Amino acid sequence: MAIKKIKKDDTVIVITGRDKGRQGKVLKVLPNSRLLVEGINLVKKHVKPNPNKNEQGGILERELSIHVSNVAIYNPAAKKADRVGIKTLEDGSKVRIFKSNGEVIDV
């Protein structure tokens, strides 16, 4: 199975688009190379009231997905966006590393 470069709970920075420069936590990774990021790509959705589900109508603000190519993972050591590489350890397991300093992201 291929290892994903960005996973749930990673902190990412938007590198292009309307929210450029903002950072947030990945809430969900969608199968079509898209991400839901907390506080990024917010839209207002108008919702009708639904008494069957006890839902109140109004204007809701929610996140839409953003393509994975529009974000970069946040490197806390360098305090900036970084690229992700994949390194195979001696025991055969693969880990994600930061390209700038070679530091392991997760074990």
Swiss-Prot record:
Query: Pfam families under this entry?
Result: KOW (PF00467), ribosomal_L24 (PF17136)
Q: Tell me which UniProt keywords the record has, alphabetically.
A: Ribonucleoprotein, Ribosomal protein, RNA-binding, rRNA-binding
Q: Does the keyword Ligase apply?
A: no
Gene3D superfamilies (UniProt xref): 2.30.30.30
A Gene Ontology biological process noted in the UniProt record is: translation
Record's GO cellular component terms: ribonucleoprotein complex; ribosome
Q: Which PROSITE patterns match?
A: RIBOSOMAL_L24
Question: Entry's NCBIfam families?
Answer: rplX_bact
Q: Which family is this sequence assigned to? A: Belongs to the universal ribosomal protein uL24 family.
The record's subunit annotation is: Part of the 50S ribosomal subunit.
Q: What does this protein do?
A: One of two assembly initiator proteins, it binds directly to the 5'-end of the 23S rRNA, where it nucleates assembly of the 50S subunit. One of the proteins that surrounds the polypeptide exit tunnel on the outside of the subunit.
Q: What is this protein called?
A: Large ribosomal subunit protein uL24
Query: Which species is this UniProt entry from?
Result: Coxiella burnetii (strain Dugway 5J108-111)
The protein's gene is named rplX
